[in-house]
Design a protein with these regions (language model features):
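Rossmann-like NAD(P)(H) cofactor-binding subdomain of soluble oxidoreductases
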Residues: 1-61
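Soluble or luminal CAZymes and related metallo-dependent hydrolases
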Residues: 3-4, 26-27, 81, 85, ...
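Short, surface-exposed connector motifs at secondary-structure boundaries
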Residues: 13-20, 71, 215-218
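Internal alpha-helical scaffold of NAD(P)-dependent oxidoreductase catalytic cores
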Residues: 14, 38-43, 60-161
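Glycine-rich beta-alpha junction loops
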Residues: 28, 48-54, 79, 106-108, ...
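Short, solvent-exposed polar/charged micro-motifs at secondary-structure junctions
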Residues: 54-58, 110-115, 173-175, 235
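NAD(P)-dependent Rossmann-like dehydrogenase/reductase catalytic/cofactor-binding core
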Residues: 144, 148-235
């Protein structure tokens, strides 16, 4: 996850050679800046495991692949080019039935997804599980409010959330958004993915909240809901 970038980037800078590096993880603005300090754009590109996830308990490692229509694997170059290397990795994902989509604005997808994931994670952690989250209208409403705060921060930073079609859900009136969210997030595979991520990466969740809150306050965005949920979970 993005907690390890500071450790791995100096190593990659010295040893990557002519390798093409695929960063396949959550990304916020400071992560993009850190990568640029160590690598040139010709050395790397981006993706995200949007339709796969999992976790483990004492006796089992489990994985999940979402079969939802909107699930896919985003890929893209930092500069938006549809390059040969992106096409090659897209072909590999296609062979694995992971539905790759090449974006010409992958940074916008990643940054706004970070905000969405933070808001969803806040709700899931408050509800104690993905299944509880998907069935609780009040927590879903609060999570959507948190997502809206995060997406407003993205907008202030120059990443237009409405450029990503999927973000439209979070701008709908609650009486429309909440029933849709219940149907989407009640998917069994998604619940497993949610639980795996939130239960096994609390430090990453905390960093996500802090990143958005810090940049929100810096740019005059009110992030009351995110702050309130973060304090309730981690204090």
């Amino acid at each position: 996850n993005n907690l390890h970038l500071k450790e791995i980037l100096p190593v990659l800078s010295k040893s990557a050679g002519n390798a093409h590096i695929l960063f396949f993880q959550n990304m916020w603005i400071d992560d993009l800046d850190s990568i640029n300090k160590y690598l040139s754009e010709k050395q790397y590109f981006f993706g995200f495991p949007f339709m796969v996830g999992g976790g483990r308990d004492a006796g089992c490692i489990y994985s999940a692949i979402s079969g939802l229509k909107q699930s896919h694997t985003p890929l893209g170059e930092p500069n938006g080019e549809i390059s040969e290397r992106v096409r090659k990795i897209a072909d590999a994902f296609e062979d694995a039935n992971l539905k790759p989509i090449i974006y010409n604005q992958i940074k916008i997808w990643l940054i706004t997804h970070y905000a969405v994931a933070a808001g969803l994670s806040a709700g899931i952690m408050k509800a104690k599980s993905g299944r509880n989250f998907a069935s609780n209208s009040d927590i879903l409403k609060e999570a959507i409010k948190a997502i809206r705060e995060g997406l407003e921060v993205c907008q202030k930073l120059g990443y237009n959330p409405k450029a990503v079609k999927a973000n439209g859900l979070y701008f709908l009136p609650f009486f429309i958004a909440i029933p849709i969210a219940k149907k989407v997030y009640g998917n069994e595979a998604l619940c497993l993915m949610f639980d795996g991520h939130t239960q096994h990466s609390p430090d990453e969740m905390k960093k996500m909240f802090e990143d958005i809150i810090t940049d929100g306050e810096k740019h005059g965005v009110k992030v009351y809901i995110l702050k309130q949920i973060k304090e309730g979970i981690f204090n």
